[in-house]
């Protein structure tokens, strides 16, 4: 069995490669394709995809013989469209009766013709007056092949249009240089803005720290003043209470004088009473004496 390599881009491989379009790949397998095309020469590689296939021969004459012998043939109830990979057909007519995709796969089967268009458009630059080739029926393309087609299209353009490729590369290089300069300027501006913002943030932090220190100092001063005021108030209270007690103990000097005067009066009264009593006794004695005489 031949290998699966059918994507070499050298001129010899391109000219000895056969493209088979409108192939019913639900029925036709790789072994069937090799059996049909091996009669024209030795096959170096064969790859079957959804709706189409490639056959790589060792010699260009074998590939041309296969195109001449098999183009328009009915394979698995479909008329295949065969040509050299290096010489695609510009206008493909509706040779024979082709079955629609709805008949083959049902109404829900989706077709993707993008790979076939990209494959030929990338390799060849058609004149403006010639329309691009129409899509080949049942050319459903897998995602892996699409990525390969992007690489092949770039290679094809660089191989056949070297001057345009060089010009495009020089322009892209200049554009890249300009873009780099612009990006560099933008980055420097952003850096300056960031530095200024950082400086502003540092200033704000310093101011906030100063304000916090001032607030703390003010609070401490208030606390100290309030504590000193409380101490003074307590001292004054203590002094006032002590003075009241002293005054209560000492008493009023006027009251003492009054008390002394009252005591003197009482003594005088007592003395007067004693005198009167003595005088009364003397009178009695004198009257008694007179009576005795």
Swiss-Prot record:
InterPro entries: hnRNP_C, Nucleotide-bd_a/b_plait_sf, RBD_domain_sf, RRM_dom, RRM_HNRPC/RALY_subfam
Annotated GO MF terms: identical protein binding; RNA binding
Coiled-coil regions listed: 177-225
SS bond partners: none
Keyword list, A-Z: Coiled coil, Nucleus, Ribonucleoprotein, RNA-binding
Biased composition regions of type Acidic residues, renumbered to the chain: 242-267, 275-284
Lineage: Eukaryota, Metazoa, Chordata, Craniata, Vertebrata
Cellular localisation: Nucleus
One Pfam family named in its UniProt record: RRM_1
Predominant subcellular localization, coarse grouping: nucleus
Family affiliation: Belongs to the RRM HNRPC family. RALY subfamily.
Function: May play a role in nucleosome assembly by neutralizing basic proteins such as A and B core hnRNPs.
Stretches with biased composition (Basic and acidic residues): 206-222, 229-240
Protein name, UniProt field: Heterogeneous nuclear ribonucleoprotein C-like 1
Domain of life: Eukaryota
Domain RRM: 16-87
Lyase recorded as keyword: no
Ranges for region Disordered: 137-177, 206-293
A single GO cellular-component term on record: nucleus
